[in-house]
Amino acid sequence: MEFILSLVGSLLLIICVLVSVAFLTLLERKVLGYIQIRKGPNKVGLMGIPQPFCDAIKLFTKEQTYPLLSNYLSYYISPIFSLFLSLFVWMCMPFFVKLYSFNLGGLFFLCCTSLGVYTVMVAGWSSNSNYALLGGLRAVAQTISYEVSLALIGFKILLFSLL
């Protein structure tokens, strides 16, 4: 019974995160519309609330294209793996109701975020384009350099909270 409750809680958490991302993009589009003095996405329905759902329908009905010389499987698996990694990060966050009890939640966070580097590298490599490979390697170098500073800042916060 406890397994089913944790599974339902995890599924509810993932759905809430995905819906909140959709409405954060709506907020971003509204702010950009006001900054650029244009109408923005608030013309669909009541205050633009159905806009993220219309965007999702448009996204799912688009034609899928892929480079002819790409490694098909790794080209499509790497973004899906990146999405799952970013959703796994939310599992270690402390909520009012504990879904999963992590003693080393900070380490789990660092591991999940550092594995995201490999998805970018595989996506750049699998397209069989030199420009995509160079862009992927550049993104990997940037991500690794930012992760080192993030880990040091987290370690500093942890160290000062124990004192």
Swiss-Prot record:
Any one GO molecular function term: NADH dehydrogenase (ubiquinone) activity
EC number, as in UniProt: 7.1.1.2
Q: List the disulfide bonds.
A: none
Q: How does it sit in the membrane?
A: Multi-pass membrane protein
PROSITE patterns recorded: COMPLEX1_ND1_1
Which Gene Ontology terms describe the biological processes this protein takes part in? aerobic respiration
Does the UniProt entry include the keyword Translocase? yes
**Where are the annotated coiled coils located?**
none
Q: Which transformation does this protein catalyse, written as a reaction?
A: a ubiquinone + NADH + 5 H(+)(in) = a ubiquinol + NAD(+) + 4 H(+)(out)
* Cellular component terms (Gene Ontology): mitochondrial inner membrane
UniProt keywords, alphabetically:
Electron transport, Membrane, Mitochondrion, Mitochondrion inner membrane, NAD, Respiratory chain, Translocase, Transmembrane, Transmembrane helix, Transport, Ubiquinone
Specify the enzyme's EC class, one word.
translocase
Residue ranges crossing the lipid bilayer per the database entry:
3-23, 77-97, 104-124, 143-163
Q: Tell me where the signal peptide lies.
A: none
Superkingdom of this protein's organism: Eukaryota
Localisation per UniProt entry? Mitochondrion inner membrane
Which Pfam families does the UniProt entry name for this protein?
A: NADHdh
Q: Does the keyword Nucleotidyltransferase apply?
A: no
Role summary:
Core subunit of the mitochondrial membrane respiratory chain NADH dehydrogenase (Complex I) that is believed to belong to the minimal assembly required for catalysis. Complex I functions in the transfer of electrons from NADH to the respiratory chain. The immediate electron acceptor for the enzyme is believed to be ubiquinone.
Similarity field: Belongs to the complex I subunit 1 family.
Query: What is the name attached to this protein's record?
Result: NADH-ubiquinone oxidoreductase chain 1
Q: Which organism is it from?
A: Drosophila algonquin (Fruit fly)
Gene responsible for this protein: mt:ND1
